[in-house]
Amino acid sequence: MVPRRPASLEVTVACIWLLTVILGFCVSFNVDVKNSMSFSGPVEDMFGYTVQQYENEEGKWVLIGSPLVGQPKARTGDVYKCPVGRERAMPCVKLDLPVNTSIPNVTEIKENMTFGSTLVTNPNGGFLACGPLYAYRCGHLHYTTGICSDVSPTFQVVNSFAPVQECSTQLDIVIVLDGSNSIYPWESVIAFLNDLLKRMDIGPKQTQVGIVQYGENVTHEFNLNKYSSTEEVLVAANKIGRQGGLQTMTALGIDTARKEAFTEARGARRGVKKVMVIVTDGESHDNYRLKQVIQDCEDENIQRFSIAILGHYNRGNLSTEKFVEEIKSIASEPTEKHFFNVSDELALVTIVKALGERIFALEATADQSAASFEMEMSQTGFSAHYSQDWVMLGAVGAYDWNGTVVMQKANQMVIPHNTTFQTEPAKMNEPLASYLGYTVNSATIPGDVLYIAGQPRYNHTGQVVIYKMEDGNINILQTLGGEQIGSYFGSVLTTIDIDKDSYTDLLLVGAPMYMGTEKEEQGKVYVYAVNQTRFEYQMSLEPIRQTCCSSLKDNSCTKENKNEPCGARFGTAIAAVKDLNVDGFNDVVIGAPLEDDHAGAVYIYHGSGKTIREAYAQRIPSGGDGKTLKFFGQSIHGEMDLNGDGLTDVTIGGLGGAALFWARDVAVVKVTMNFEPNKVNIQKKNCRVEGKETVCINATMCFHVKLKSKEDSIYEADLQYRVTLDSLRQISRSFFSGTQERKIQRNITVRESECIRHSFYMLDKHDFQDSVRVTLDFNLTDPENGPVLDDALPNSVHEHIPFAKDCGNKERCISDLTLNVSTTEKSLLIVKSQHDKFNVSLTVKNKGDSAYNTRTVVQHSPNLIFSGIEEIQKDSCESNQNITCRVGYPFLRAGETVTFKIIFQFNTSHLSENAIIHLSATSDSEEPLESLNDNEVNISIPVKYEVGLQFYSSASEHHISVAANETIPEFINSTEDIGNEINVFYTIRKRGHFPMPELQLSISFPNLTADGYPVLYPIGWSSSDNVNCRPRSLEDPFGINSGKKMTISKSEVLKRGTIQDCSSTCGVATITCSLLPSDLSQVNVSLLLWKPTFIRAHFSSLNLTLRGELKSENSSLTLSSSNRKRELAIQISKDGLPGRVPLWVILLSAFAGLLLLMLLILALWKIGFFKRPLKKKMEK
């Protein structure tokens, strides 16, 4: 291998990706985007394609995969170790892992093996690196099985594994050489042998070669099993000398090779194809034997290639016709593919390539399975994951690129069969090239482990398969499907334990090629919550929408996109990272490498409870140029503290480099404010300002600080704060003492805690109804360095100073509050979606003295969510665990009434049977116990949740004709003799947020006339796995499918009207199906129209009605009226039937016609129609 110039890799303290980023343009929390460490390498080597944080006894490192290192020829790929936390910057070092990554006893092809494209750390120390395009040669075929290596903590390859298989393209080749004196020069024959043998993979389980030389006698130069490698055979072949002799006994040489060289004693293998290559330069002296010798070779299936060297004839100017015909007769059929001739010995090397290709073609025929690949092209190691017990290796190329997951544990390797991951629907329409194993992961649940694999090309929309390992067998539990064709749903999987209880809380599934509204590859991440052994959809995450502009002519474009495709590919990398913001919950980082015209960006989402917050906490853009540095966010890892500050750091890779971002500590700052006096009493002035008496107030503001990561240590913080008086008013009613300003700004250094005092005075204003709000805003003096403020806590504090109570001349205010409540619904709430609203109207009235700080407190059941308020007259509501609404603040006067509405929405995570609300009205004023009974109201309203499903029905036939002249068969031997088949299909598809309940589907159809004649005959039904239909006695009740013969009587004629009135008189059969909860349920019923009944019946046309009725088995989960029933009408008509009109109809019609004629004649007579005016004129 030609030595290659090592890539120039330098570590710089400032991340070169972020030089062009302005801090203000990105949402920032506690990942430091200014002071980072970067590692750069050639973009053409894909340096940065994978990254992992790593620690061993030598120190802390960033491991970086570079799958195409070795440009421009070998491109084996490799892994670099990049030191961090050292006093001085040190370069990254290539580990040269492919050199020691090897599988014994195979001919390896490491070029383009993309080693380092998969890189995962081992929880027990060391790491795993894979080259999914590693191949080995089997004959002339290259099998891309992929390979993975366990690397020790000291960066040494411990062992390598790949699903290599024994080559089944084996050949036993015996070369029969003419060594007579006429062969000249002999060196040309040896050169021919060398060129031919170099092209063969020689070994005990591959091709074996033996050489026989003949002239007057036959010599075995070496046997088939003599040498076990190509190199050994070449050495032996170079030592072969010419035997000599005056005669050429070709038939003897061939027959000896057949009888002796192809025996097991000389290394021939049973069942292996036999090949003989005969090289000669003249006619044989025993050609009379050739015909029988060749027939014996044919009988033993020996393929023969014959080579005629014409040098002796050309040098003697002799005719070659007879010689060529003899050598052609030796070759196997077809002769044109098995016979060669060369002008002389020197020209032998010119046919080596063609001869080799034709011999190699026999290898392919020896392995008939080569047409359909199993693990030969598996690309094992395309993805990898360490679970508790198993190492999971994705093998996307297995089974004709359907893919599989190789499970390895210690020395055990489980390679699932092609059908192992096929679900029942998939067997009917087997997916091709679904790439199962594109990514793999696992989830830990109490007492078990779930294994997860993605197949992004399944059914073109993608799928995720969840399964368990039970005694080495795979048991599929669930599949999750994508929603958009080509989105690559399932190409990225990550599981995460948010609350650190050792059990998985979420599964995140990436669909990085999800198309946005403008056909840009926006990308999408689906979040699923773990519920026992199943995953339930929770939410979707999307990036900032990218504007795709190929030309600046578009007015909305501000920057032209130079790179295609446009978009973000959000979800290309999804990493579960340890608690970044030190809030006790683990976090998620998602890469969007195509953002900003292929520069790339990442998004950080903080964990909360058992899920993540839907809004991202921080977006880190690359700032790269999209060429020398691009696809920032291609790889992410954040598991370790690499600089010793106790905080998790994040490593982000792209093509051309990687960056290590340090996390900043989180400062917890809490502020309290107290006032003396704590109420404003205008009647009691306590100071003079500018010669006027007024009310002065002393404010004490205390700051308490600590670091989240070091709560027990003393922390000193430099803060800047600003105090604003009467902050709710545009014009303030108070100023700070000694100034005429409502605002002051100061700096303070706080060591654990510190209190300061400020005084202010009230202005002579007449508006003293609303309290005075004092607002204190604070921030760190240097927000770009050191810790950051906790974003879970406010950096603004508000306190209200109320005015003194107005109770007239009384010292005590005795209020009497009443609370009246009404709701929009009283008897039953039907909830159709989480956006449905439920209003509660509250009326608070004070029948006593002024009630100060009047408020209503609302407690509600967890199936309700506070949405907002309407029509409130004063102030507003706050919602924490309870809803507290200030009513008439600061006081509710005597006789005053306030009415407002509280609006609720429904929490789809808690489906309770009742909506329960407890409301109370209270104040800071006194109220007698006997008047408190009207201060509280309890509401309990039953709730039902309308499941958003879709209920479809269809039939294969809607009209069937019965010929009038059709005859009734004497016997019914099979269902084909009964009549037309009608297939009825029912589909129930889940929609909406509510879970699917257990359902009951009742399918009714007319099966017998009133006289007991069959109408529709059920021959069977089928359904999805979650459906169970009964009774089975309805299925083929006459047993016709079982071979029972049925005799039909032709003499009977149905009473008139029996069929015509079938809708009301026919007997009805009902199939009842129980449906377990599923996103999709299907039931198909096959019915036969019993034609003998309709042939003997009198009718022209009628409808048969089939009814499907759906019912929920859960009293809380109901169905909408539009999704409960479905009816299908099948029209039956009789063709060519003459109409038979009743006699009374004929007589009545004749009488009516005569009566009408008489009336017409009478009318004409009355108007003189029958008089002749001309006759009267003549008479006159």
Swiss-Prot record:
InterPro entries: FG-GAP, Int_alpha_beta-p, Integrin_alpha, Integrin_alpha_C_CS, Integrin_alpha_Ig-like_1, Integrin_alpha_Ig-like_2, Integrin_alpha_Ig-like_3, Integrin_alpha_N. Residues 1166-1180 are cytoplasmic. It comes from the Eukaryota. GO terms for cellular component: acrosomal vesicle; basal part of cell; cell surface; external side of plasma membrane; focal adhesion; integrin alpha1-beta1 complex; integrin complex; perikaryon. Glycans are attached at residues 100, 105, 112, 217, 317, 341, 402, 418, 459, 531, 698, 747, 779, 820, 839, 882, 907, 938, 965, 973, 1007, 1084, 1103, 1114. PANTHER family: INTEGRIN ALPHA, INTEGRIN ALPHA-1. The integrin I-domain (insert) is a VWFA domain. Integrins with I-domains do not undergo protease cleavage. Belongs to the integrin alpha chain family. This is Integrin alpha-1. It comes from Rattus norvegicus. The lineage of its organism: Eukaryota, Metazoa, Chordata, Craniata, Vertebrata. The gene is Itga1.
